[in-house]
Swiss-Prot record:
InterPro entries: G_TrmE (IPR031168), GTP-bd (IPR006073), GTP-bd_TrmE_N (IPR018948), GTPase_MnmE (IPR004520), MnmE_dom2 (IPR027368), MnmE_helical (IPR025867), P-loop_NTPase (IPR027417), Small_GTP-bd (IPR005225). This is tRNA modification GTPase MnmE. Exhibits a very high intrinsic GTPase hydrolysis rate. Involved in the addition of a carboxymethylaminomethyl (cmnm) group at the wobble position (U34) of certain tRNAs, forming tRNA-cmnm(5)s(2)U34. (6S)-5-formyl-5,6,7,8-tetrahydrofolate binds at R24, E81, K121, K453. It is found in: Cytoplasm. It comes from Rhodopseudomonas palustris (strain BisA53). GTP binds at residues 228-233, 247-253, 272-275. Keywords: Cytoplasm, GTP-binding, Hydrolase, Magnesium, Metal-binding, Nucleotide-binding, Potassium, tRNA processing. The keyword tRNA processing applies. GO terms for biological process: tRNA methylation; tRNA wobble uridine modification.
Length: 453
């Protein structure tokens, strides 16, 4: 029996113990299962209280049962839900009973959503939106994912594809029946006008999106600098907890440490790196190499110095902006009575990174200003990302492919070639929606879902 012909079940709520556990069932044997466990089928989409029993008639739990006959259900199949008390023993008894039915099995990760996709309840962009919603860490990520789940891109792509197919039909009618006198002499002009308008809409969407797809992964900020300048202390201040070991001994941090922050709803990953210096220690050398590599990939570099140090960030090979952060200002200023920032400017001249910040990572002085600046940088970096319809590189690539073919079709080509261009553009939008050649994308996407979703 094919996997899609089997009835599946899974825990769709949090892991036990919990107040309530929800077990979802989807497939053709759903009605038989509900009747066997609860005695009868509930009225569709109405909650029914029932003492559910196992195959031997032994009570499992006093539960609430819901019944959603297909195709008017989340998956398009018959769906049942058992709302039980969330104890481990109760859940285990229900799961064991469900497993005892023929052609009924535990669901794979993302299998409920995949069945919803296969039955046309959602398209691929909406499934991706659901995946993003499940994994959203910040409010802006949540809002972006919810828009995608509700068809922000999918609805537009479906409309564009329908219009392309209509234009293609006009052109092919002109080709096929040109000698029969059954169609107007010139069907190409209105079709090309439609194509030009569509190309303009797709081009405008691509131009306006900015970094909307980056909102899923977040902004990367690397803390870089010489050893023992307080990088780990600054990391702990930003995280508001101890995530990195702080020691007075240089070279304590040997590997890259990451912490994920929520700055006004923007996801930011801060990286604490090994101190950059020449060393004979092979382990420390590897730490320095990794620090330089991660700094090169960062969207923003914080070059951290102790307040009395003079050192340019020459070791960083990155096109990202570099901000100077002078740490330990409480110690340096009090001990020397001088202004180290002036010394830095005198020695480095125009090479001083801007903007610059003076902080005490140990005491917390200046941290609020730095965090505020990071939040402003994130807002500018992402722009209106949360409202963007393009949330994955796959979306951008396929929209570009469709746009290229639409633009080709406008260049005075023969009608047969124009029809083929439109066929290619339609295929790209079909792949975007999950209607054409996307099996590898589906496998990768639904593996990322949790079991029960």
């Amino acid at each position: 029996m094919h996997a899609s012909d089997q009835t599946i079940f899974a825990l769709s709520s949090g892991r036990p113990p919990s107040a309530i556990a929800i077990v979802r069932v989807s497939g053709s044997r759903g009605a038989k299962i509900v009747e066997a466990l609860a005695g009868r089928l509930p009225t569709p989409r109405m909650a029914m209280r029932a003492l559910i029993k196992d195959r031997d008639g032994e009570p499992i739990d006093d539960a609430v049962v819901l019944w959603f006959p297909g195709p008017a259900s989340a998956t398009g199949e018959d769906v049942a839900e058992f709302h039980i008390h969330g104890g481990r023993a109760v859940l285990a008894a229900l799961m064991a009973t469900l497993s005892s039915f023929e052609n009924v099995r535990a669901a794979e990760p993302g299998e409920f959503t995949r069945r919803a996709f296969e039955h046309g309840k959602i398209d691929l962009t909406e499934a991706e939106g659901l995946d993003d919603l499940i994994h959203a860490d910040t409010d802006r990520q949540r809002r972006q994912a919810l828009r995608q789940l509700n068809g922000l891109l999918g609805d537009r792509a479906r409309d564009w594809r329908a219009q392309i197919i209509e234009a293609q039909a006009l052109i092919e009618a002109g080709i096929d029946f040109a000698d029969e006198g059954d169609v107007p002499d010139d069907l190409l002009a209105p079709a090309l006008a439609k194509i030009e308008a569509l190309a303009g809409e797709i081009e405008a969407l691509l131009a306006a999106q900015g970094r909307s797809e980056r909102l899923r992964d977040g902004l990367v900020v690397a803390i870089v600098g010489p050893p023992n300048v307080g990088k780990s202390t600054l990391m702990n201040q930003l995280a508001r907890r101890e995530v990195a070991i702080v020691s007075p001994h240089a070279g304590t941090t040997r590997d890259v440490i990451e912490v994920h922050l929520d700055l006004d709803g923007y996801p930011v990953t801060v990286i604490d790196t090994a101190g950059i210096r020449d060393s004979d220690d092979p382990v420390e050398q590897e730490g320095v190499r990794r620090a330089q590599a991660r700094a090169a990939e960062a969207d923003l570099v914080l070059w951290l110095l102790a307040d009395d140090q003079v050192a340019a960030p020459a070791a960083i090979e990155s096109d990202a902006p570099v901000w100077l952060v002078r740490n330990k200002v409480d110690l340096a200023g009090a001990a020397t009575g001088v202004k180290p920032a002036k010394n830095l400017e005198a020695n480095l001249g125009q090479n001083v990174p801007q903007p610059s910040f003076a902080i005490s990572a140990k005491r917390g002085d200046g941290i609020a200003d730095l965090v505020g600046a990071l939040g402003g940088f994130a807002a500018e970096f992402f722009g209106a990302g949360e409202a963007g319809a393009i949330t994955r590189q796959r979306h951008r690539d396929l929209l570009r492919d469709a746009l290229v073919m639409l633009q080709c079709s406008k260049r005075g080509r023969a009608e047969e070639l124009v029809a083929e261009d439109l066929r290619s553009a339609s295929r790209s939008l079909g792949r975007l929606l999950g209607q054409v050649d996307v099996e590898d994308v589906l496998d990768a996407l639904f593996r990322d879902f949790c079991i029960g979703k």
